[in-house]
């Protein structure tokens, strides 16, 4: 189960216990429990509507009505505002990417506030995403889907956050771009970033994740390490249809 999958070398940085969340009167999360350790890539897997994105938004403080416990580096952030959570070193890259269409690539990169020391410089961003340097003066609407995703990830790397939450970063992208995103995540992990990933593309997730949690109907129903993947393929087929 999920508790057994949590044994890794890094210290715990995020602990979520009995997380409940609502959109208006709609009760979406029904007691989510999971943790993330330093330097890991942890993936939340599940079908559409399972509650994965709501979980990320709750951690980020975007969902107004939420209860339970969310602790980051030992600090209780359950009821903190999004700006205070960002200053703790957490960044969220939404599925819709949020690129400002009227701004060019440079302006999009310079817009986010630096919330902590250690944010990537433009030169470091261009080393990670060479395409963005080539499109520096292009408007957001002129970028391909893959370039928009690169820009969305690059923007949160500018903030100084070391805990990244990526929501469906491969959605709608060509296989060659998905591979590039995978290489980027692996490189960020090697540089000490901790990543919480939401994915439906299990085959992609299996190339980058250290651990998995399965989310269904607003609850974590299972969890295992990447080393246990082959032993859990039947379960994954049942849960996800992969």
Question: For each predicted feature, which ranges?
Answer:
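Glycine-rich phosphate-binding loops of nucleotide-dependent enzymes
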Residues: 2-242
